[in-house]
């Protein structure tokens, strides 16, 4: 019975962020209709010829619609408090999926692992009267930013699309899908890898047995939030390199030349955010270097297409 319960808990924790996005997607199905109606009211004029002020007005409404989407998702996240904070506080528990995985990896290679623990040596506290309420509000807003990210990208595309050729518009539609996918993969990477590694290392670090770790709730949530969002942005590297290559800022030769430097930077970052064992550092470094190599391939592809256009 205990084994069955453990398997279920593992699946539950592993799927929590995915389930959250899935459920909120269906909750906000009417959101698209609402924003379309706002779009009809505010963007009915032809965009064939627009002055600078017209562009500013259009940008203002794109920002307003994006903000509305983020706030609506944030309100639902605020209502689903228990579910959201179950996700956030899961990495502080010793039976979190990632800790069990690293513990098994350590046993496989025959060395002791800091992840083989039932409970991390710290507690979370709120030291101000409005601390928990403030944390609830800001967590809901950031949940709105993460979940509504594809729609925000869509609004960005709608703003720049009038200036694009038809073939570039088709490419931009693919950009929204790929960029959203990369972002959510990065979010999951940050949640299941970077966050538990950071929480385990920082929460367990001690300069003296005399000092007990009593972490403020804002500090803990900040670590989770920064890990998740920063990884989501880092995973946009191929998209960023694509546009930088189109603009002539970056070339594949430049990226190949500084590949070793990039590897050193990645290893240093991995050494900072992971416990001092080689296995953890390698597991963190490999996906980031893989993204770098993919970005080199994309840069070469874009440069070749641009050169063919000139010819």
Question: What annotation goes with each model-predicted range?
Answer:
Residues 27-311:
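Membrane topogenic/interface segments and analogous intrinsically disordered interaction regions
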Residues 6-17, 24-29, 33:
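Short, often N-terminal, low-complexity regions
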């Amino acid at each position: 019975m205990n084994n069955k319960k453990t398997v279920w808990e593992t699946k539950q924790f592993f799927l929590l962020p995915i389930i959250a996005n899935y459920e909120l997607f269906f909750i906000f199905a009417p959101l698209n209709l609402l924003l379309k109606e706002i779009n009809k009211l505010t963007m009915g004029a032809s965009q064939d010829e627009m002055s600078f002020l017209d562009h500013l007005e259009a940008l203002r409404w794109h920002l307003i619609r994006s903000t509305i989407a983020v706030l609506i998702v944030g309100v639902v996240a605020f209502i689903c408090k228990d579910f959201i904070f179950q996700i956030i506080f899961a990495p502080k528990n010793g039976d979190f999926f990632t800790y069990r995985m690293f513990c098994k990896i350590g046993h496989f290679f025959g060395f002791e692992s800091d992840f083989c623990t039932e409970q991390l040596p710290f507690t979370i506290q709120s030291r101000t009267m409005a601390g928990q309420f403030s944390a609830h509000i800001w967590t809901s807003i950031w949940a709105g930013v993460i979940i509504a990210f594809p729609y925000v990208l869509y609004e960005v595309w709608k703003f720049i699309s009038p200036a694009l050729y038809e073939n570039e518009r088709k490419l931009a539609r693919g950009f929204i899908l790929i960029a959203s996918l990369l972002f959510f993969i990065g979010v999951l990477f940050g949640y299941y890898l970077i966050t538990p590694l950071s929480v385990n290392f920082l929460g367990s670090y001690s300069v003296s047995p005399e000092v007990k770790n009593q972490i403020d709730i804002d500090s803990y949530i900040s670590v989770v939030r920064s890990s998740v969002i920063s990884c989501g942005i880092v995973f946009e590297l191929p998209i960023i390199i694509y546009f930088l290559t189109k603009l002539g800022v970056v070339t594949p030769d430049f990226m190949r030349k500084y590949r070793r430097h990039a590897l050193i930077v990645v290893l240093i970052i991995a050494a900072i955010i992971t416990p001092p064992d080689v296995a953890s550092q390698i597991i963190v470094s490999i996906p980031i270097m893989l993204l770098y190599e993919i970005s080199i391939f994309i840069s070469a592809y874009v440069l070749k297409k641009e050169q063919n256009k000139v010819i």
